[in-house]
């Protein structure tokens, strides 16, 4: 495994980061800005990021975009559509907007009208129902109750590999959200003064942020191994790598987000502080394709 990104992958990362930085929400108030979201939706649709897999992109490329979008709190669909694209590809003449279902819910479903679910016997399609209330302020969910109809044949190998991609993509979302929350906390610690000094100069705050940074670096390591494994290892090995990454990244991201709230002090518990938006996204991404320790062979024997 070569951990270095290629020049094309670095360009992809920079493009995704620029898009998220320019059009993503910079404040909680921006989440209600419909015109901004329309511009963001048009920009994401124009990039073709949602069709990465049918364009031949690897799991690494999908993870790159997912991570940068989560870091910038991009609040238009990516996760659901890119996973749906991997299941069925780009069909000629199909104008529907697709996402995927998990436990009876169409995830990341804003603007989507059709949903796919993967079963042992194949891929099935159904309508996206009414919006389902959720904690995530950046992604909507819809009901996925059917009726279902067979949509596409899928090989056993692809069927076994897709869960690894789904886990890895949600893991990338967790890592990106953790990075965003950490950036928010560090920037605040640099400017918030107490007792004549910025709070970041005090060991109590500095050590908290250093621990968060270490957790993020560990998450990045397991994420990139899992993303590489999606296409390079056998499905069973790829799935195990993805499960391990998801377990580690989920716990790390929650800790990082909670630390970011703590660093902000009283303002961290207010609606206006973006820290809770990152935490909400992390909590929801953790429950998308969740993993137990026993499934990764990490439980107590």
Residue ranges: model-predicted function:
Residues 73-187:
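FAD-binding core of flavoproteins
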Residues 266-301:
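Glycine-rich phosphate/cofactor-binding loops in nucleotide/flavin-utilizing enzymes
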Residues 1-72, 300-301:
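Amphipathic, small/basic residue-rich leader segments at the start of a protein or domain
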Residues 24-33, 53, 186, 216-247, ...:
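C-terminal helix-coil-helix/basic helical segment that borders enzyme active sites and/or dimer interfaces
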Residues 13, 169-232:
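Extended amphipathic alpha-helical segments enriched in small hydrophobics
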Residues 19, 171, 185, 212, ...:
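Amphipathic alpha-helices that form helix-helix packing interfaces
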Residues 5-8, 12, 33-36, 198, ...:
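Residue-level recognition of alpha-helical structural elements
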């Amino acid at each position: 495994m070569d951990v270095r990104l290629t020049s094309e992958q670095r360009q992809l990362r920079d493009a995704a980061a620029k898009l998220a930085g320019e059009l993503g929400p910079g404040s909680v108030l921006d989440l209600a800005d419909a015109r901004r979201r329309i511009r963001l939706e048009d920009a994401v649709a124009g990039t073709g990021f949602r069709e990465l897999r049918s364009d031949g992109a690897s799991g690494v490329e999908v993870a790159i975009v997912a991570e940068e979008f989560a870091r910038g709190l991009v609040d238009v669909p990516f996760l659901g559509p890119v996973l749906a694209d991997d299941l069925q590809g780009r069909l000629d003449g199909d104008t529907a907007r697709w996402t995927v279902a998990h436990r009876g819910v169409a995830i990341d479903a804003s603007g989507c009208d059709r949903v796919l679910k993967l079963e042992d016997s194949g891929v099935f399609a159904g309508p996206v129902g009414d919006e389902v209330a959720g904690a995530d302020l950046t992604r909507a969910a819809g009901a996925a109750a059917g009726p279902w109809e067979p949509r596409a044949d899928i090989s056993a190998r692809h069927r076994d590999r897709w869960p690894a991609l789904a886990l890895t993509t949600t893991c990338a979302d967790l890592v990106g959200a953790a990075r965003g929350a950490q950036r928010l906390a560090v920037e605040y610690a640099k400017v918030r003064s107490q007792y004549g000094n910025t709070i970041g100069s005090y060991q109590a705050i500095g050590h908290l942020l250093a621990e968060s940074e270490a957790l993020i670096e560990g998450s990045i390591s397991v994420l990139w191994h899992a993303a590489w494994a999606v296409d390079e290892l056998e499905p069973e090995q790829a799935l195990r790598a993805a499960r391990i990454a998801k377990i580690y990244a989920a716990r790390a991201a929650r800790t990082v987000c909670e630390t970011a709230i703590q660093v902000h002090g009283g303002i961290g518990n207010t609606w206006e502080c973006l820290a809770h938006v990152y935490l909400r996204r992390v909590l929801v991404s953790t429950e998308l394709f969740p993993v137990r320790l026993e499934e990764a062979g990490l439980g107590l024997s």
